[in-house]
């Protein structure tokens, strides 16, 4: 018999990877994780994703697979679909997309032809790469037209959206964003889409957990089709879903996902999605969503009171976007300084940004992950003051910046020690 090392622990077989995992757990446990697209999943979600379902190949859909032995994974996928539809009150759902980008591409494949016109939010005003950005396939395969925000308010300019739609006659309009902190008027977008005979795609990747928790407007009843990732405010594994109330669109989506763009689904991830959807259906998730929103609003208020420029003047979501141009520093400089101080966020373009994407004039902060850790209003007030201290020091030279980083790091240590991420299972050999 050929020797098989399948029963050897990772710490014994591959210490390099094991040590990296252990170090990453320590990093997550000892720094403030303020990246808006990240969250902390539960022990149950981790257990599902790390299960033996990773061994099972299951091309096709529940009840119609190309492989035998799929009866049990069919149960899991059906649970995920049923729970997702119940969570958002929709009729049809596909839980197989591997990522949000792929989910959007699968919608394009289902509803569009190469060369069709799409209308989405510009990248610098808060849109996503898949909404028509030039380097992305959405900007290469389609005639991409972009709408933006009002220069004075930072809010989506619906008059511009309508004018562009009437002029460009898009086949698809995308309502959604990756760094837009305010509410999106899905009803207004649908009215514009109807005027030009376009499909409306709502990309709620960032907002889905808040929508599930009743803290952000729902696109259902307005959008023809809805996509979302499952790992941001929804607090599930990394992956995505596509939802609709239209059976004909659902049929097209099914074919677009498989066999159009994917082969075998990741059944261990779908199991983790099912677990996360059950968690989101629990009444406590509404309390979580409410706390996420309250924490982000407190954070925005403190940052504003400390003299920083909060884009749109506040937030209606988990996202707080800072414009650093008045401080004479870049997003790259400030995000690096904050990380040294123990606060992890990301550099981010702000409306009408003239800096390169790898530099930017802003930073994006999010409240979802640290709310999952258990931080509340008092802690987010402290975080706001700590962020402001670092930002203000960045414009005062290296010595003052280093001193501020050291001082803030000590305070961050106190915050995270009080609320360790005890839900995370740690492998003994790691």
From Swiss-Prot:
Keyword set includes GTP-binding: no
Enzyme class, spelled out: transferase
Pathway recorded for this protein: One-carbon metabolism; tetrahydrofolate interconversion; Amino-acid biosynthesis; glycine biosynthesis; glycine from L-serine: step 1/1
A GO MF label: glycine hydroxymethyltransferase activity
GO cellular component assignments: cytosol
Sites annotated Plays an important role in substrate specificity: 231
One GO BP: glycine biosynthetic process from serine
Transmembrane segments: none
Location of this chain's protein in the cell: Cytoplasm
Cofactor(s) annotated in UniProt: pyridoxal 5'-phosphate
EC number per UniProt: 2.1.2.1
Reaction catalysis annotation: (6R)-5,10-methylene-5,6,7,8-tetrahydrofolate + glycine + H2O = (6S)-5,6,7,8-tetrahydrofolate + L-serine
Modification sites for N6-(pyridoxal phosphate)lysine: 232
Entry binding sites for (6S)-5,6,7,8-tetrahydrofolate: 123, 127-129, 248
Keywords on record: Amino-acid biosynthesis, Cytoplasm, One-carbon metabolism, Pyridoxal phosphate, Transferase
Pfam families reported for this sequence: SHMT
Protein's job: Catalyzes the reversible interconversion of serine and glycine with tetrahydrofolate (THF) serving as the one-carbon carrier. This reaction serves as the major source of one-carbon groups required for the biosynthesis of purines, thymidylate, methionine, and other important biomolecules. Also exhibits THF-independent aldolase activity toward beta-hydroxyamino acids, producing glycine and aldehydes, via a retro-aldol mechanism.
Similarity section: Belongs to the SHMT family.
Subunit structure: Homodimer.
PANTHER family tied to this protein: SERINE HYDROXYMETHYLTRANSFERASE (PTHR11680), SERINE HYDROXYMETHYLTRANSFERASE 1 (PTHR11680:SF35)
Protein name per its UniProtKB record: Serine hydroxymethyltransferase
UniProt source species: Anaplasma marginale (strain Florida)
Lineage: Bacteria, Pseudomonadati, Pseudomonadota, Alphaproteobacteria, Rickettsiales
Gene: glyA
């Amino acid at each position: 018999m050929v020797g098989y090392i399948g029963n050897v622990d990772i710490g014994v077989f591959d210490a390099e990877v094991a040590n990296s995992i252990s170090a990453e757990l320590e990093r997550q446990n000892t720094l403030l994780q303020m990246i808006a697209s990240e969250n902390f999943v539960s022990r149950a979600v981790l257990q599902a994703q790390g299960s033996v379902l990773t061994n099972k190949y299951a091309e096709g859909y529940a009840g119609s697979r190309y492989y035998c032995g799929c009866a049990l994974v069919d149960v899991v996928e059906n649970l995920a679909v049923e729970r997702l539809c119940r969570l958002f009150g929709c009729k049809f759902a596909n839980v197989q997309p591997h990522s949000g980008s792929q989910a959007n591409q699968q919608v394009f494949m289902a509803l569009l032809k190469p060369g069709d016109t799409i209308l989405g939010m510009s990248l610098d005003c808060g849109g996503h790469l898949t909404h028509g950005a030039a380097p992305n396939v959405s900007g290469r395969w389609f005639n991409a037209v972009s709408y933006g925000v009002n220069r004075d308010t930072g809010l989506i300019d619906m008059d511009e959206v309508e004018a562009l739609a009437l002029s460009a006659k898009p086949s698809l309009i995308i309502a959604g964003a990756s760094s837009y902190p305010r509410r999106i008027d899905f009803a207004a977008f649908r009215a514009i889409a109807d005027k030009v005979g376009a499909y409306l795609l709502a990309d709620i990747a960032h907002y889905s957990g808040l929508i599930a928790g009743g803290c952000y407007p729902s696109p259902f009843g307005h959008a023809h089709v809805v996509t979302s990732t499952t790992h941001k405010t929804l607090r599930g594994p990394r992956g995505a879903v596509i939802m609709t109330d239209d059976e004909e669109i659902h049929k097209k989506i099914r074919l677009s996902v498989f066999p159009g763009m994917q082969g075998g689904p990741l059944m261990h991830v779908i199991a983790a999605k099912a677990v996360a959807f059950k968690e989101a259906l629990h009444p406590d998730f509404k309390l979580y969503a409410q706390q996420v929103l309250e924490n982000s609003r407190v954070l925005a208020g403190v940052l504003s009171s400390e003299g920083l420029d909060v884009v749109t003047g506040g937030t209606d979501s988990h996202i707080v976007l800072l414009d650093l141009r008045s401080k004479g520093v870049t997003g790259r400089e400030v995000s690096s300084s904050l990380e040294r101080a123990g606060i992890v966020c990301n550099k981010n373009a702000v409306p009408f940004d003239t800096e390169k994407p790898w530099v930017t004039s802003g930073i994006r902060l999010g409240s979802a992950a640290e709310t999952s850790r258990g931080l509340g209003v008092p802690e987010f007030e402290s975080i706001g003051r700590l962020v402001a201290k670092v930002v203000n020091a960045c414009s005062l030279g290296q010595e003052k910046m280093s001193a501020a980083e050291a001082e803030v790091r000590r305070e961050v240590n106190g915050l995270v020690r009080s609320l360790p991420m005890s839900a995370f299972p740690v492998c003994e050999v790691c």
